[in-house]
């Protein structure tokens, strides 16, 4: 199975998340405030919400992008109903539901030789994707030393790679959104991070939504 087939299968596997949103939307006064990471807001989330938004004319939806720490704080303050992140959260009243495993990919404008062994990535060209779950997943396979170019969002890493400034690792959705297929390569052995749905444990959802979360 190719990387792109894997990404498409994840879209198809997110039926439970669509069901949750659809049941929230059945309320005639339905309002959903969804927060997500910036990279997901540019790639995965628009794909997810478009269909059910169009099918539910009563739905009022607000979308916001923040880093995970801010999303958790907004959940605590009840400023958002749900959040999508690429890491589980164990904090206070926050419940985490694993939605899918998202492949990580090697991105490089100048590489053309198929799958990449993470140990063979050129440290001198490495663009650090920042201190978050993606970097933690990478660190389980290889510890990259301090680099000249460090970014705080996956999307920014793809922009620098597009300009030939170096190489990095990112999630398949951010890569597909911003880069040509020939710049995106599998990693061996494969690495994945978790796409997670966060919500407050003390906020009730519809019966069907509650069944999904349980």
Where do the PLM segments sit?
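Short helix-loop capping/hinge motifs at secondary-structure junctions, enriched
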Residues: 110-118, 190-191, 202-208
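Alpha-helical "hinge/linker" immediately C-terminal to small N-terminal DNA-binding modules
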Residues: 1-23
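Hydrophobic hinge/microswitch elements
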Residues: 67-72, 76-80, 86, 132-185
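Flexible hinge/capping segments at coil-to-helix
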Residues: 25-26, 91-130
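Beta-alpha-beta core module
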Residues: 91-98, 102, 156-204
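Central regulatory/effector-binding core of bacterial HTH transcription factors
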Residues: 19, 29-91, 151
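Secondary-structure junction motif
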Residues: 118-146, 154, 205-209, 213
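Short amphipathic alpha-helical coupling segments at ligand-binding clamshell hinges
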Residues: 2-6, 44, 48, 138, ...
């Amino acid at each position: 199975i190719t990387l792109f087939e894997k990404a498409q299968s994840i879209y198809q596997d997110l039926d439970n998340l669509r069901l949750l949103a659809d049941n929230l939307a059945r309320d005639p006064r339905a309002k959903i405030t969804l927060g997500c990471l910036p990279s997901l807001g540019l790639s995965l989330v628009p794909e997810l919400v478009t269909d059910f938004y169009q099918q539910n004319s009563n739905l009022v939806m607000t979308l916001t992008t923040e880093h995970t720490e801010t999303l958790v704080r907004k959940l605590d303050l009840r400023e958002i109903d749900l959040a999508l992140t690429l890491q589980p959260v164990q904090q206070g009243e926050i419940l985490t539901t694993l939605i899918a495993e998202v492949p990580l990919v090697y991105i490089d404008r100048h590489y053309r030789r198929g799958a990449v062994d993470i140990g063979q990535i050129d440290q001198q060209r490495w663009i650090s994707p920042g201190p978050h779950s993606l970097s933690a997943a990478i660190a389980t396979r290889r510890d990259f030393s301090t680099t000249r170019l460090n970014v705080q969002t996956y999307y920014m890493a793809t922009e620098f790679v597009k300009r030939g400034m170096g190489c990095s690792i990112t999630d398949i959705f951010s890569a597909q959104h911003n880069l040509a297929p020939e710049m995106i390569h599998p990693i061996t052995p494969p690495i994945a991070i978790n796409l997670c749905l966060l919500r407050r444990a003390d906020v009730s959802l519809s019966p069907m939504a509650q069944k999904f979360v349980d």
